[in-house]
Amino acid sequence: MDFLEKVLDNQVSESKELVKLYDYDLYTLGEAADRMRQNMHQKIVYFNVNRHLNPSNICADACKFCAFSAHRKNPNPYEMSLEEILEKVKNSYNKGIKEVHIVSAHNPNYSYEWYLKVFETIKQEMPNLHLKAMTAAEVHFLSTKFNKPFELVLEDMLKAGVDSMPGGGAEIFDEEIRRKICNGKVGSSRWLEIHAYWHKLGKMSNATMLFGHIENKIHRIDHMLRIKKIQSPKNQVENKEGGFNAFIPLLYQKENNYLKVEKSPSAIEILKTIAISRILLNNIPHIKAYWATLGLNLALVAQEFGANDLDGTIEIESIQSAAGAKSRHGLEKEDLVFKIKDAGFVAVERDSLYNFIQKF
């Protein structure tokens, strides 16, 4: 039996073996990943109508890969008030967004109660808006700053109206690499524990992997396997229990930060990474090719290599664009639909839990 066939048959589980998948040519990997993708999702490409909101860029951490936080290369600190946040969300809601995605720097000036008040107010005023908020890194920050168990932070978030968690803060799970790129940030084990407890509460989240910086291919494989391990076996496609909805390989953006990575991965390596994630993560229903970091054209190509989602209209995005991504002003829904259909796929607007809203 060929090695790839053994992998597809779940006969290989070690990172040092699975890294050999990168030795396959792109066509072979893509064919295997696309076959899995079509078995799960046919020719559908999902998107949602959403807004990203980043309340502050003032951060207690100093991650070397980050161009968003206020530092020497980004000397313009800001922090939004509750009223400013509410106004921005309302404006977008009135334009038709179905989800607001709130991720902030780890601002030491905000109180614990402030976060909960933001969530409660949004849900009180817009109860039908899906509130995706608080990365595991933010949860850990609040837990340590305010001396609260992370379990309590998650329970308070749930009571305040948070519907799901984004997958940010995972970066790459190898602790040696984490010490070099984001020393002091939430550790890999705690990141996984936070998501596992959120799932235990019956809620959904995503998982990300930042790649294309100083990590190597075996670090990526190890990262994927750790995500796979904590995914509930009950949650393979239908998502009726808490678990990971989607895995999102995030391409590192190299501008305006201190990591000093000169060369980005080739398009071939990017597509191989996406294909391998589909092949390995057979218990996670969706693989997202995040157009805000890949660019829309490459993200559409990735739909032939295992991905089945582009993310959404985004509207406003600050974190990736600060590092050079071309996502600052988002996309119109009509443009996304046209691009998806023009690439030969069926465009489906989804809600945040992948329920169909409209098929195009």
Regions found by a protein language model. Name each.
Residues 72-229:
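Conserved Radical SAM active-site core
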Residues 1-27, 87, 93, 224-228, ...:
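Auxiliary Fe-S-binding modules of radical SAM enzymes
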Residues 41-50, 55, 59-60, 64-73, ...:
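Mobile, glycine- and charge-enriched loop segments
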Residues 10, 33, 63, 102, ...:
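Conserved, mostly hydrophobic/aromatic
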Residues 49-52, 73-76, 103-113, 175, ...:
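Glycine-rich, proline-tolerant flexible connector loops at the mouths of alpha/beta enzymes
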Residues 45-51, 100, 131-135, 165-167, ...:
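Hydrophobic faces of well-ordered beta-strands that scaffold small-molecule active sites
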Residues 30-72, 77-103, 165:
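N-terminal pre-triad scaffold of radical SAM enzymes
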Residues 18-21, 51-53, 104-108, 211-214, ...:
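Conserved short loop/turn motifs at secondary-structure junctions
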